[in-house]
Amino acid sequence: ASDGSENLLALAVEAARLRATLGEISDALEQKFGRYKAEINTFSGVYSNEMKNDVSFEKAKKLANQFSKNEGRRPRIMIAKMGQDGHDRGAKVVATGYADLGFDVDIGPLFQTAEEAAKQAVENDVHILGVSSLAGGHKTLVPKVINALKAYGRDDIMVIVGGVIPKQDYRYLFDAGTIAVFGPVTKISDTA
């Protein structure tokens, strides 16, 4: 199949008939063709252009600038999409907003595990790990990422959660160690 002369689907079906697992079939294809990796692109200036006369936007920018002066570097946030949550448009909008406020922003790839997100946050030396949750995995994944950060000795990294989070779950997330939870209508500048 690697030369492109045969139908991959037919070959995969035949392999399954011969008792190959889906994982084995996928691994064989990945070894030959590689794994798709989505490119993460963000834009700058869009949020700041729309919010330039907003009081909370200006206040958040001033706070970010003051942080930079005090700490010798800009505040750094990582936006993580963990588990099976592939809804990344909102996370990209949030990332753009934070960048326009003066933050250094890292965006994790889609479908990270809690361990992978924590590792990236530690390696990138972020101040804040923002978990974007739109698929209901917050009660499992957020405690896991907080525990993974603790295992790295980095419980100083603040964890915030944004997305479609039922109000009744907020207390659970706070008890797990989250410092803030933001719903869908929250202004980005108010979260900074």
Role assignments for model-derived ranges:
Residues 91-191:
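Cofactor-cradling patches in redox/metallo enzymes
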Residues 1-16, 21-22, 28:
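Catalytic-core signal marking the mid-to-C-terminal active-site face
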Residues 82:
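Conserved ATP-binding TGD loop and adjacent catalytic N/P-domain core of P-type ATPases
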Residues 76-78:
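Conserved beta-strand elements of the Class I
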Residues 18-58:
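Terminal amphipathic helices with adjacent charged low-complexity linkers/tails
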Residues 2-6, 61-74, 119-125:
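Glycine-rich phosphate/diphosphate-binding loops that line cofactor/substrate pockets in enzymes
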